[in-house]
Structure formats: structure tokens, C-alpha cells
């Protein structure tokens, strides 16, 4: 740390983040800052002694939001490899339920491109029901700051109405399996 400190002292707004490996740190340097700030470096582990009766050859999605509304992110993790399948955000003046909905539809659309019928897990009953109804039933008002989010919602709803899919969309059982592996790890 002392050697590192010499290189970073004097920068009053510097932000610090550690990574398990030099390769992961280098990769993060080449990516968008917002994909890494405030986030765990690894997917959430299963609870001790938890078994995995869920399909490990599947995708897990999750969203995080700093308020209601707030700054929202969403992502998917490939459970067979533990790698990030996609990551989106930040989106301003959004909600967690919107992020969960967009994450599920994004996963469906991405998987459909290659005919992949893997299961998608989400820990949001609300978002799963919105996807089944092909409608994001948010009560959030449209405003200039969240215009991009509403464009994505419109696009997602259109995709649901114009495409079919056979991917099971299942509720992640947090009480049995621990936090969903796509979790951002920022719960208080």
C-alpha cells in the first residue's frame, strides 16, 4: 500500500478499488468506471451448506437502485461460468423493479439470438409477472432524466409482443440458495 500511496496521494477525489488479480484490475481499467464502482468483484456465493437444486446451466439477473427512484443498474451472470453475461447502467431516476424487468427481457433477447433456451432466474416476483404480462406496470412518471429508461421499457415491451421464447423464467429462492449470484452486494 505504501508504494501505491506514493502514486495516488494528492488527488483529493481519488477512488480506490481492489481486485483479486492484476488481470481483473487491468480489465476494469479498460472498461466503464460505472460498471465497477460500488460493486463486488465476484458473484454472491451460495449460503454455507446450501445445495444447488437450481439449474446451474442458466442465467441469473439482478438490478440495483440507489433510491426509489434512484440511479439504477442491471446485469446478468452466466451461472455455469460465473462470468458477467451483460451489465447495463447507470440509468437515472429509475426503480429496482424496472431494472429487474429490463434485465429479464434483455436476457431473453440476448439468448434468443443464438437459440439458447436456458433458464433465467430473477429474485423479483414483480418483474417476472410483468414479463409474463408483457407490460412494465411501473407507476414512475416519465421525465427528462429518465427518458432513456422509458425508451428501453418501450423497446422491451415491443420485443415481448413480437417474439416468442421457451426459456423458463423462475424465481430465485434466496432463503434456500443465498443471494442471487448477479447481486450487486449493496444491500444495507
PLM features per residue range, with description:
Residues 7-9, 18, 88, 178, ...:
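Helix-coil modules at protein/domain termini and other flexible surface or pore-lining loops
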Amino acid at each position: 500500500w505504501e508504494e501505491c500511496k506514493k502514486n495516488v496521494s494528492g488527488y483529493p477525489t481519488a477512488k480506490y478499488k481492489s481486485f483479486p488479480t492484476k488481470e481483473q484490475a487491468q480489465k476494469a481499467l479498460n472498461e466503464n468506471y460505472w460498471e465497477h464502482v460500488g460493486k463486488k468483484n465476484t458473484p454472491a456465493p451460495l449460503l454455507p451448506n446450501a445445495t444447488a437444486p437450481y439449474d446451474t446451466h442458466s442465467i441469473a439477473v439482478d438490478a440495483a437502485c440507489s433510491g426509489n427512484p434512484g440511479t439504477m443498474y442491471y446485469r446478468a451472470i452466466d451461472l455455469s461460468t460465473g462470468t458477467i453475461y451483460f451489465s447495463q447502467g447507470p440509468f437515472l431516476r429509475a426503480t429496482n423493479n424496472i431494472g429487474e424487468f429490463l434485465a429479464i427481457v434483455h436476457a431473453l433477447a440476448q439468448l434468443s439470438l443464438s437459440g439458447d433456451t436456458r433458464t433465467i432466474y430473477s429474485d423479483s416476483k414483480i418483474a417476472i409477472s410483468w414479463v409474463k404480462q408483457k407490460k412494465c406496470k411501473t407507476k414512475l412518471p416519465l421525465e427528462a432524466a429518465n427518458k432513456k429508461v422509458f425508451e428501453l421499457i418501450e423497446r422491451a415491451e415491443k420485443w415481448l409482443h413480437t417474439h416468442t421464447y421457451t426459456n423458463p423464467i423462475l424465481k430465485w429462492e434466496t432463503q434456500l440458495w443465498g443471494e442471487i449470484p448477479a447481486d450487486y452486494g449493496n444491500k444495507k
